[in-house]
Curated annotation (Swiss-Prot):
Gene: pyrD
Entry binding sites for FMN: A60, G61, L62, D63, K64, T84, N137, N170, K215, T243, G266, G295, Y316, S317
Main location (coarse class): membrane
Transmembrane segments: none
Entry keyword Acyltransferase: no
EC number, UniProt record: 1.3.5.2
Gene Ontology biological process terms from the UniProt entry: 'de novo' pyrimidine nucleobase biosynthetic process; 'de novo' UMP biosynthetic process
SUPFAM superfamilies: FMN-linked oxidoreductases
Subunit structure comment from the entry: Monomer.
Catalysed reaction equations from the record: (S)-dihydroorotate + a quinone = orotate + a quinol
Known cofactor(s): FMN
Upper classification of the organism: Bacteria, Pseudomonadati, Pseudomonadota, Betaproteobacteria, Nitrosomonadales
Name assigned to this protein: Dihydroorotate dehydrogenase (quinone)
HAMAP family, per the entry: DHO_dh_type2 (MF_00225)
Length: 342
């Protein structure tokens, strides 16, 4: 209810400024004891050999640098994913690069992996004191040639390995040039092979297994989804996140800002991402768990993703439009049902 009063004020601000103000405010409320933990009784969901206190997580992108982990966790999330992070700090694309389309409950972003770099992220994670399930989302620097992308992912994997509950490999952002080519069969075969080999080496070295999740795009043909599913199983990936933002503009092309360049998220992505989940589930047959993301604007949207085959879900744009109550409503609905982990 409180968010319904605050949202019009936040929407008067530039979207990126509002984003910063929101994170700063949450941190202040947490530090001063004015942000109580929202907890709902829920049977833990076991996915990737991890016990998630509830199946509703925060998607990567909201807290890129891990500066607000504990405060965001207080909103009732069962897990938090930070990033995308790259080996070296980078400023991302020029501003403006974040656009609201309120008539469609949508957002377009072309942020470009702006982040403080993996070393600073690790410092922030350590300082947060967060003890819940934490995913760290990794990517490549914009100036790293595509043929050297594997090196960037391996650098990040080595550095975050002991600090993450699981690691997400982002190969599906539309805002880093050529990145989505890593979803092609040849490139993906090489990347997954290298990641699995390094994960095995790190597991042997540290005596700890940190799962790997691959985040894919919603703009894939059925044949591509089939190939990706086969490669995920071949290389024994631990999870797949479906999906990232879309380059399609159905439902917003006629609206102000609707044709801005970048990835579209929010309500227009809901059905598209759920369709990808359903197709993946059909191919994977529970061999690899699916984390559903993209256009969860209501608890019902999340439930439909679970019914399509997801074991967990993640929220981001829905939080911007519906506020923190979306988290508790979604947790309440999903935890009132019997959920089966992959």
């Amino acid at each position: 209810m409180m968010y319904n009063l605050l949202r019009p004020l936040l929407f008067l601000l530039d979207p990126e400024t509002a984003h910063t103000v929101t994170l700063d405010t949450l941190n202040l409320l947490k530090r001063t004891g004015l942000l109580p933990d929202r907890t709902i009784d829920c049977t833990p969901v076991r996915v990737m050999e991890l016990d998630f206190p509830n199946p509703v997580g925060l998607a990567a992108g909201l807290d890129k640098n891990g500066t607000c982990i504990s405060a965001l966790a207080s909103l009732g999330f069962g897990f938090i994913e930070v990033g995308t992070i790259t080996p070296r700090p980078q400023v991302g694309n020029p501003r403006p690069r974040l656009f609201r389309i309120p008539q469609a409950e949508a957002i377009i972003n072309r942020m470009g992996f702006n982040n403080v770099g993996v070393d600073k992220l690790i410092e922030n994670v350590q300082q947060s004191g967060y003890r819940g399930i934490l995913g760290i989302n990794i990517g490549k620097n914009a100036d790293t040639p595509l043929q050297n992308a594997i090196d960037d992912y391996l650098i990040c994997l080595r550095k975050v390995y002991l600090h993450a509950s699981y690691v997400t490999v982002n190969i599906s952002s539309p805002n880093t040039q050529q990145l989505r080519q890593l979803q092609n069969e040849t490139e993906l075969e090489h990347l997954l092979g290298a990641l699995k080999a390094e994960q095995t080496r790190l597991s042997d070295l540290h005596g700890r297994y940190t799962p790997l999740a691959i985040k894919i795009a919603p703009d894939l043909e059925s044949e591509q989804i089939t190939v990706i599913a086969s490669l995920l199983m071949k290389h024994r990936m631990d999870a797949v996140i479906a999906t990232n933002t879309t380059t399609a503009r159905e439902g917003v092309e006629h609206l102000p800002r609707g044709n801005e360049k970048g990835g579209l998220s929010g309500a227009p992505l809901t059905e598209r991402s759920t369709t990808v989940i359903r197709q993946l589930a059909n191919h994977l047959q529970h061999a690899i768990p699916i984390i559903g993301a993209g256009g969860i604007m209501s608890a019902r949207d999340a439930q439909l993703k679970i019914e399509a085959g997801a074991s967990l879900v993640q929220i981001y744009s829905g939080l911007i439009y519906r506020g923190p109550d979306l988290v508790t409503k979604t947790v309440s609905l999903l935890c009132s049902r019997t959920t089966h982990a992959g």
